[in-house]
Amino acid sequence: MMTTDIQDGLQELDSLLSHADWQLADEVTFQIMLAVSDRRDAGWLDQSAIANFPCATLHQLDQRWLFYSSGRFGFSTQLHIYREAAERSSFEFSRQAGWVMNLWQPIGFFNFYHWLNFSLDAPQGHLPALWFWEMPWYRSWLIGGFGTGRGGGFGDPSLFDALMLRLERCQSI
């Protein structure tokens, strides 16, 4: 992705976040992530793309989400919750962030993306989320989804774990 494209995307993100348009901001965040990772054609992020995600862009995205949500949303907020939740179970973050529908305890299925709460009333760490939801239909089927992303599927923490590891490594830079 060209530097000017990144800057344009970040300016658009600033505008959306400043107007509390959380869902569109989430979509723009995902588009920036795809472009920076050279995954626009694929339309989703895999573990390799996350592992090689540029730290500078990750920090820029995170700082914007943190600033405009007063620390409620952002990758750093997710990392903080993830660290605490990991002591109990790998799926606990998803429950705390409101990403899971609790139909039967202790089993939970991921919400459909359009069921997420795109307001400041959402649980802490709820957004950004689209980067985690988007996946090809066949991967969705493999985790029990309906071919539309994570919705209705079981937990597959590998992608989220990859981003949390990348964020930890980027924080030390």
Feature-to-residue mapping (PLM):
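Surface-exposed peri-terminal alpha-helical interaction modules
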Residues: 2-173
